[in-house]
């Protein structure tokens, strides 16, 4: 039928034609995707070859046939769309086949192109409705429809290019070329998501989500939900529509978070609870493989001392190799998000604060300029996002005097000027330095951790040693989330809306253990991907060497992290978004004063941090060796201060002890940080002692040291 000339049809006849085309097909087995890829590669070769030969031939011609002009002017479309189709078909699972030896999708695409040659989306939707009334397409087939349509068009073009003499002699008419390139242009410039979602039988079930959340999720999250339905259908040997309906039926009977059908796709797939990984097996694997490597080194070096001293450097190699393999074997775990197309809603009211010291009269205006930049970069978040400076003064041996007051007043004036310029939306939070008995200096209580704790107390309406020096205080009462940044961290375009969208998703809502006061499911904190600022990364040769390329990756996708991908728990590094209520419940008065320098790991563990790899912040980095090692010293010192959290009982914020609420994975992270801090020491010690032994021992010690450092 597809070889006959196209005949215009009304809507009813179009649907009937599609249904008849489906009835003619008889399913038989599967066809590997590599067969489609092979056909498409051959077609692209023919098109490229024809274009090259005709480009040379046309130089000697005074006039060109119309079809040749079409090909030479538009061949790039065929190459571009063909390459995209090849990428989509790469390493795909087999597709359903027909008795003709082709895939069902190829037959569907060919008849669709005959019936709707201009690929008008409204008409194509009618065609798919008719076709699927007889033979429903799977989610995977729908996801590959556009690439297969492109491949079919490239195949048609290759057929015309096979007759070079006919092209040169004008036997191929321009009317044969026009619909092919018109179709490729439509595929290239069209937005196909709405069409494919409308044609999806699974989508029609999922949009009935009793909680009402599914239609308001972003496009990627909805697509992953459909993919999860397909995975579960395959696992339990169900039809995709049947699996989706089962999840919907369970959600209709559920209450609270279980009323969202996503619960029955991820938390209790089709009613069968999944048991989360604890991290014990991962820690045992690293430990066991490290011991095995040490025993092997003992035999190779001929002395147990080398094995004992090098077990920590060997563990560096083992862990890095294991993580490298796991990141490639385990698919990334994207975080579900709400779309927030109208901006941050009232129930997601968000305050973004830059935590910083005021070190001079110019500090406040500089920080205010940052806030203005962040506001302009995140206008899509709307009025429910506001920004502020969370300011302290540097440590001092005397109470705050006229100088400190002048610095604060300069910051207040800068924020007030922004409020006047933009009609509000900016804040200055300030803490007057208090005397610390331990340090015998005037300083902000518990530095950054204390500043955030007091900010949360202020937001919760509790007494706090924090003053609102500028900004509308009444708006703060209903703040639900806080984005915390350092002075050298940049909030990139659209990042605030992405962060809040992740926090608002029902599957990410934190579940707090009332006894332990830690988050046991969901996430109360998200850590975005952090890249190095482009300017900071190029400030010195040292920064280039240790800071990487720097800048924002505009083509970046979901980031991989072993902890998040395997255990649904990321690692907090001090920049991100957290829930005000969960922070107040889990962290207020939780830790002893003056004992914890590195609090990010503990906060992330208590709040069950997640990694939002789709969002990115940029941060500064040390540009001198001294700055790098000073920062490393602070980190290592802070890691060792967390040693008590490896035990059964840990200090609390009231001078007593409580049962350690940390899960095994969080304790492993603490232990791993301690191991990593000792590794260079043992490496150096082994190299020094290796010089006193045989050359073989020294060679093994040096080899392990180099590989450990490089890994």
Language-model-detected regions and their locations in the chain:
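Basic/hydrophobic alpha-helical interface regions
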Residues: 3-7, 15-20, 26-33, 37-64, ...
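Non-transmembrane, amphipathic alpha-helical segments
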Residues: 6, 25-42, 62-73, 77, ...
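ATP-dependent phospho-/nucleotidyl transfer catalytic cores
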Residues: 6-99, 424-481, 643-676
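N-proximal low-complexity "stem/linker" segments adjacent to membrane-targeting elements
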Residues: 64, 312-319, 323, 328-351
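Active-site activation/catalytic loop segments of kinase-like enzymes and analogous catalytic loops
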Residues: 101-142, 149-166
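Short, well-ordered loop/turn and helix-capping segments at boundaries between secondary-structure elements
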Residues: 114, 133, 137, 151, ...
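Alpha-helical bilayer-embedded segments of polytopic membrane proteins, i.e.
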Residues: 150-160, 274-323, 528-532, 572, ...
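Internal catalytic domains of large membrane-associated glycosyltransferases
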Residues: 171-280, 333-656, 660, 667
């Amino acid at each position: 039928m597809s070889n006959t000339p196209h005949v215009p049809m009304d809507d009813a006849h179009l649907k009937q034609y599609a249904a008849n085309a489906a009835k003619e097909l008889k399913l038989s087995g599967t066809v590997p995707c590599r067969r489609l890829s092979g056909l498409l590669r051959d077609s692209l070769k023919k098109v490229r070859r024809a274009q090259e030969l005709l480009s040379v031939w046309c130089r000697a011609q005074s006039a060109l046939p119309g079809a040749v002009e079409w090909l030479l002017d538009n061949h790039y479309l065929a190459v571009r769309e063909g390459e995209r189709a090849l990428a989509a078909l790469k390493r795909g699972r087999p597709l359903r086949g027909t008795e003709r030896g082709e895939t069902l999708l190829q037959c569907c695409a060919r008849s669709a192109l005959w019936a709707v040659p201009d690929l008008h989306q409204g008409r194509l939707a009618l065609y798919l409705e008719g076709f699927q009334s007889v033979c429903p397409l799977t989610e995977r087939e729908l996801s590959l429809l556009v690439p297969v349509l492109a491949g079919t068009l490239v195949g048609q073009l290759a057929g015309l290019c096979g007759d070079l003499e006919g092209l040169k002699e004008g036997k191929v008419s321009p009317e044969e070329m026009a619909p092919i390139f018109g179709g490729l242009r439509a595929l290239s410039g069209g937005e196909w998501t709405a069409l494919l979602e409308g044609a999806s039988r699974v989508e029609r079930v999922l949009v009935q989500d009793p909680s009402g959340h599914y239609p308001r999720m972003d496009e990627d999250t909805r697509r992953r939900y459909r993919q999860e339905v397909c995975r579960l259908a395959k696992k339990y040997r169900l039809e995709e529509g049947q699996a989706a309906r089962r999840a919907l039926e369970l959600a209709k009977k559920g209450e609270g978070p279980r009323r969202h059908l996503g619960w029955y796709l991820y938390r209790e797939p089709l009613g069968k609870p999944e048991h989360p990984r604890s991290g014990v097996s991962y820690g045992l694997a690293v430990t066991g493989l490290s011991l095995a490597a040490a025993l092997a080194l003992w035999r190779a070096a001929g002395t147990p001392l080398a094995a004992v001293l090098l077990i920590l450097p060997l563990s560096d190699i083992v862990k890095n190799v294991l993580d490298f393999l796991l990141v490639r074997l385990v698919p990334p775990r994207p975080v579900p998000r709400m779309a927030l197309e109208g901006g941050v809603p009232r129930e997601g009211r968000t305050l973004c604060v830059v935590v910083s010291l005021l070190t001079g009269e110019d500090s406040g205006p500089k920080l205010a300029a940052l806030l203005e930049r962040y506001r302009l970069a995140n206008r899509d978040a709307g009025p429910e996002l506001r920004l502020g400076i969370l300011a302290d003064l540097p440590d001092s041996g005397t109470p705050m005097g006229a100088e400190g007051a002048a610095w604060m007043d300069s910051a207040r004036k800068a924020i007030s000027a922004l409020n006047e310029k933009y009609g509000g939306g900016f804040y200055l939070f300030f803490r007057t330095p208090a005397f610390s008995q331990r340090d015998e200096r005037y300083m902000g209580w518990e530095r950054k951790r204390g500043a955030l704790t007091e900010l949360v107390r202020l937001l919760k309406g509790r007494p706090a040693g924090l003053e609102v020096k500028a900004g509308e205080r009444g708006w703060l009462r209903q703040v639900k989330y806080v984005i915390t940044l350092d002075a050298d961290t940049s909030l990139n375009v659209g990042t605030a809306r992405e962060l809040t969208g992740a926090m608002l998703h029902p599957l990410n809502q934190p579940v707090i253990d009332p006894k332990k006061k830690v988050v046991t499911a969901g996430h109360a904190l998200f850590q975005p991907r952090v890249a190095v600022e482009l300017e900071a990364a190029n400030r010195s040769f040292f920064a280039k060497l240790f800071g990487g390329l720097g800048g924002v990756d505009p083509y970046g996708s979901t980031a991989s992290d072993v902890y998040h991908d395997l255990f649904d728990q990321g690692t907090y590094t001090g920049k991100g978004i957290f829930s005000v209520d969960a922070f107040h419940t889990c962290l207020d008065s939780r830790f002893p004063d003056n004992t914890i320098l590195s609090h990010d790991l503990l906060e992330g563990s208590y709040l069950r941090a997640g990694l939002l790899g789709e969002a990115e912040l940029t941060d500064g980095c040390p540009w001198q060796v001294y700055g790098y090692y000073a920062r490393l010293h602070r980190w290592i010192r802070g890691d060792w201060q967390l040693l008590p959290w490896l035990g059964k009982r840990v200090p609390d914020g009231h001078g007593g002890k409580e049962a350690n609420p940390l899960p095994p994975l969080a304790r492993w992270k603490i232990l791993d940080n301690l191991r990593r801090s000792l590794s260079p020491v043992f490496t150096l010690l082994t190299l020094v002692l290796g010089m006193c032994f045989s050359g073989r021992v020294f060679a093994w010690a040096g080899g392990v040291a180099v590989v450990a450092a490089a890994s």
